[in-house]
A protein has these predicted regions:
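Active-site groove signature of glycoside hydrolases
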Residues: 164-188
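Loop/turn elements at helix/coil->beta-strand transitions in domains of secreted/extracellular proteins
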Residues: 92-97, 172-175, 214-218
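Active-site beta-loop-alpha junctions enriched in small/polar residues
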Residues: 100-106, 182-184, 222-226
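Catalytic and substrate-binding clefts that recognize carbohydrates or anionic sugar/phosphate headgroups
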Residues: 1-46, 281-282, 304, 315, ...
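Aromatic- and glycine-enriched glycan-recognition loops and surfaces
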Residues: 4-5, 15-137, 153-163, 198-204, ...
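Glycan-recognition surfaces
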Residues: 113-167, 204-312, 325-348, 352-355
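Hydrophobic faces of well-ordered beta-strands that scaffold small-molecule active sites
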Residues: 97-99, 177-179, 219-221, 301
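Non-catalytic C-terminal accessory domains or segments of carbohydrate-active enzymes
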Residues: 335-336, 358-362, 371-375, 384, ...
Length: 535
């Protein structure tokens, strides 16, 4: 990197980027204190320090000018992290609180010249990326961490650093950690045995500390797609499958969906993919909610306080906070594997998944944008976005033939259109999707006993309504179904049943003889319900 302005760029990037903040002490109590700042003859109360003790910027090789906040007297005992966590849990009913930290403490690592962290033996290192990484993403050559450096602790002290950090968090009633900024670890392995060996030691120390301090295996791995990270997840079960969701970057909203779906082909075999948070009251809120519903992933939002779309959230989450999570990671259907669902102008993305009994396919028009290496940002395509035609059939769900009766037919119900069709394994239905439009289809095997045909489809009010069906069996002229949830349950029947019971109580179903649509009210109480149908 013998650029003419290299040193100037280094100072500017390092000084301006929060990626070059470094840890200079573990406790973050200062961030949560209420301190009085005197300025312009007026006193104002701050609920947060702009540069908290855990994250304060102290740049190696450059003089750091202290802020006005840094000159205030310390007050360790006031409004600490434990008090904040307790307030969140007691006043707002939040059951679990996780805290963020980077793999090496913060993006810029651990400060090499601070007395409080001197015991970790941190030294400044500048990432050395492999030729393959620089070919795929040339911008890594001038990434803030590459230019500004990372404070890398001695491998022998990492275990102690994690223990001290997690001791503090656990004592503050924190339930787990989200460990970010992992991908750079391989580029910092020189003089530490190489990237893979260094990553192995780091993850072993991290996971051992997590097991000791967060018994529920409370760790989310993030920005961790280099293989030296993924292949060292020995007990970690959850990892991000994508870049961030950027609410203000419109071009990124569709690309994000493509990234998580295609990355889950690989990551879904190793971890539970995390498709990141989204915002419900957002122009792309429903689109992203629909993908999370069938992704088999975590479901969480980054809504601004008071800005929530409950029509969307209620289709994702029950009143108890439970979700109808699919059984595995959502993956693209075979006919999408080698198509460009973001740029070719004609291919809709199709995502398949399985539930306990039924299957699900989501179709999405996410054409029109991509990541530009030339500009190093998400970019919308110049040509207008056209509608795409999506065709889907039951066999798009991998393994469905092995799980079904030979020669079976399937009931296919669309969530938004509420349309019911009966298809054979290779028969298809189709839908025209406008830009950023979507639909979710529940696929339920059609059971047959004599002249009676029946399928339990799922809750009509939930995106992944088919996930509510936990068990079904049909014997003679009766069928028994176990379902979870509340509200309207959709079924299909070739003829109206003579009686239906929910938890032993007789109910009056709605039946449409033209379509075979059979609706049963499970009531307003969320829970597991036993249903019996008789003909």
């Amino acid at each position: 990197m013998n650029y003419v302005f290299y040193h100037t760029v280094k100072v500017v990037v390092s000084s301006m980027s929060h990626f070059n903040h470094r840890v200079y002490a573990v406790k973050a109590n200062h961030k949560f204190q209420k301190l009085h700042v005197i300025g312009s003859g007026m006193s104002r109360t701050l609920s947060q320090r702009v540069l908290p003790k855990f994250f304060r910027r102290k740049l190696a090789g450059a003089s750091a000018r202290p802020s006005q906040l840094d000159l205030l007297p310390e007050a360790e005992s006031v409004d600490g992290l434990a008090k904040v966590v307790r307030k969140i849990k007691t006043e707002f009913g939040v059951e679990y609180v996780y805290c963020w930290h980077a793999l090496l403490g913060y993006w810029g690592g651990i400060h090499p010249d601070e007395e409080n962290v001197a015991k970790y033996g941190s030294v400044m290192k500048y990432p050395k990326h492999t030729p393959g990484v620089l070919t795929v993403e040339p911008s890594q050559a001038w990434d803030p961490l590459t230019v500004g450096g990372v404070g890398v602790p001695s491998p022998d002290t990492l275990a102690h650093f994690y223990v001290v950090t997690h001791d503090y968090l656990s004592a503050s009633d924190v339930d787990g950690v989200k460990v970010d900024a992992q991908a750079v670890i391989g580029a910092l392995g020189y003089k530490n045995g190489g990237g893979p060996a260094f990553a192995r030691r780091v993850h072993a120390a991290l996971e051992e500390s997590v097991r000791a301090h967060f018994p529920d295996n409370g760790i989310i791995n993030c920005m961790c797609h280099s293989t030296e990270n993924i292949y060292n997840f020995k007990s970690s079960a959850l990892a991000r499958a994508s870049d961030d969701f950027y609410p203000a970057n419109e071009a990124s909203h569709t690309v994000h969906i493509a990234n998580v779906v295609y990355n889950s082909i690989f990551m879904g075999e190793i971890v539970l993919p995390d498709w990141d948070m989204f915002q419900s009251q957002h122009v792309a809120g429903a689109l992203h909610a629909a993908t999370r519903a069938i992704g088999g992933c975590t479901v969480y939002v980054s809504d601004h306080p008071g800005k929530h779309d409950f029509e969307i959230l209620h289709q994702l989450v029950f009143p108890s906070g439970r979700v109808l999570r699919c059984r595995q990671a959502g993956r693209p259907t075979r006919d999408c594997l080698f198509r460009d669902v973001t740029r070719d102008g004609r291919t809709a993305l199709k995502v398949w998944n399985r539930n306990f009994v039924n299957s699900v396919i989501g179709v999405f028009n996410i054409q029109g944008a991509s990541w530009s290496r030339a500009t190093n940002q998400f970019a919308s395509l110049p040509k207008p976005i056209s509608a795409t035609l999506a065709e889907l059939c039951p066999r798009d769900v991998e393994g469905i033939a092995d799980r079904s009766t030979q020669g079976a037919s399937f009931v296919v119900r669309s969530h938004r259109n509420r349309r019911i069709e009966i298809l054979r394994l290779k028969e298809c239905t189709s839908i025209m999707l406008m830009h950023k439009d979507w639909e979710i289809y529940t696929i339920a095997e059609l059971l047959e006993q004599g002249d009676i045909k029946f399928a339990a489809i799922g809750l009509t009010a939930m995106y992944n309504g088919g996930g509510s069906i936990l068990r079904i069996d049909m014997n003679g002229r009766s069928a028994n179904v176990t379902a979870y949830g509340l509200g309207e349950l959709a079924c299909y029947a070739s003829r109206a049943p003579t009686s239906v019971h929910v938890d032993g109580r007789a109910v009056s179903p709605d039946f449409d003889p033209r379509t075979g649509a059979l609706s049963i009210d499970l009531g307003a109480t969320e829970g597991t319900h036993e249903l019996q149908f008789n003909w």
